[in-house]
Swiss-Prot record:
SUPFAM superfamilies in the cross-refs: Chorismate synthase, AroC
Family matches, as NCBIfam families: aroC, PRK05382.1
Subunit structure: Homotetramer.
EC number per UniProt: 4.2.3.5
PANTHER family referenced in this protein's UniProt entry, alphabetically: CHORISMATE SYNTHASE (PTHR21085:SF0)
Cofactor: binding details: Reduced FMN (FMNH(2)).
GO-annotated cellular components: cytosol
Organism from which the protein derives: Francisella tularensis subsp. tularensis (strain SCHU S4 / Schu 4)
Gene: aroC
Protein name stated in the entry: Chorismate synthase
Length: 352
């Protein structure tokens, strides 16, 4: 199965399934002498791991990462970094009733059509469980970026029709919704409780931001920085749309409104472009927004077919997120970090 490696110089290859024994990743191209320990990675994994609140899946995975190669005496050696996480809370029996059925809205049907076989236990490789290794790799990328003064943060900016204003960045990691607005917590709680009571799910918008970048990252024309970001974000489970800067709002704008004017004293006067012009970073904040679809794993019956092509009805049992976008925040941060560290290393190689 191809398509499991991301990056050009700083590469990440992942493997593992939702109900398999373990998840693993190989990170190659990491510079040497970067201080790194398991605790550095665990900090990011703890933000993504399931079972932390009543508003996400109740599957409880400690997601304890082990570094098996590429680090010696607390520093990277420049050789491939191997990471592994053991799965510990699989309940495969929850999926026994759908082993011959395709869950509507899931990858069951397409995986079976492509490979002639599928791991029906929690979606196998198509499960968002795989993203734990992306977050682990992203933690390493973040350490490198921090050395260059680059910071990445994300937040949930909309759940369903509830739009959430950005008020306090420091509050993002102090609540289970990754929102930047303390006053919006009760509304988020009520919404998720209502959705869960209905046996349904809801979509979300996640905004991810990178600050402290230099101008000049990105390689026109097919390796534009915004194209690389969109490619990375669209590889995340349940993401159905990605926009940069003002995104789709620019459709209703005039050129006189949208263009980011520049002055000698103040620099850029606005950032409608989201920090990228012509596929190259401007040095402003990079801003991307992701639309997460509502998960198809719900308790309401849905029409589908089985492997023989017969009509059937599916009710997805098991433990699932009522809103997958909530836990998508650290995943989006990780993917942006992987894109930027790769582009940074590529740009350095050009200049050297």
């Amino acid at each position: 199965m191809s398509g499991n490696t991301f990056g050009k110089i700083f590469t990440v290859t992942t493997c593992g399934e939702s109900h398999g024994d373990s998840l693993a990743a190989i990170i190659d191209g990491c510079p040497s002498n970067i201080p790194l320990c398991e605790a550095d990675i665990q900090l990011e994994l703890d933000r993504r791991k399931p079972g932390q609140s009543k508003f996400t899946t109740q599957r409880k995975e400690p997601d304890e990462v082990k570094i098996i190669s590429g680090v010696f005496e607390g520093k990277t050696t420049g050789t491939p970094i191997g990471l592994i996480i053991k799965n510990q809370d699989q309940k495969s029996k929850d999926y026994s009733e759908i082993k011959d059925k395709f869950r509507p809205g899931h990858a069951d049907y397409t995986y079976f059509k492509k490979y002639g076989i599928r791991d029906y236990r929690g979606g196998g490789r198509s499960s968002a469980r795989e993203t734990a290794m992306r977050v682990a790799a992203g933690a390493i990328a973040k350490k490198i970026l921090k050395h260059y003064g680059i910071e990445i943060y994300g937040f949930c900016s909309q759940i369903g029709s509830l739009k959430i204003d950005f008020i306090d960045k420091d509050f993002i990691n102090q609540n289970p919704f990754f929102i930047a607005n303390k006053n919006a917590v009760p509304a988020c709680e009520d919404l998720i409780h209502s959705i869960r009571k209905q046996g349904d799910s809801i979509g979300a918008e996640v905004t991810v931001v990178a600050t402290g970048l230099e101008a000049g990252l990105g390689r026109p024309v097919f390796d534009r920085l915004d194209a690389s970001i969109a490619y990375a974000m669209m590889s995340i489970n349940a993401v159905k749309a990605v926009s940069i800067g003002d995104g789709f709002d620019c459709v209703a704008q005039k050129g006189s409104q949208h263009r980011d004017e520049i002055t000698q004293q103040q620099g850029f006067l606005s950032n409608h472009a989201g920090g990228i012009l012509g596929g190259i970073s401007t040095g402003q904040d990079i801003i991307a927004k992701l639309a997460f679809k509502p998960t198809s794993s719900i308790l309401q019956p849905g029409k589908s077919i089985d492997v023989q092509g017969n009509d059937t009805t599916v009710i997805t049992k098991g433990r699932h997120d009522p809103c997958v976008g909530i836990r998508g925040v650290p995943i989006a941060e990780a993917m942006l970090a992987l894109v930027l560290v790769d582009e940074l290393l590529i740009t350095r190689s050009y200049r050297d």
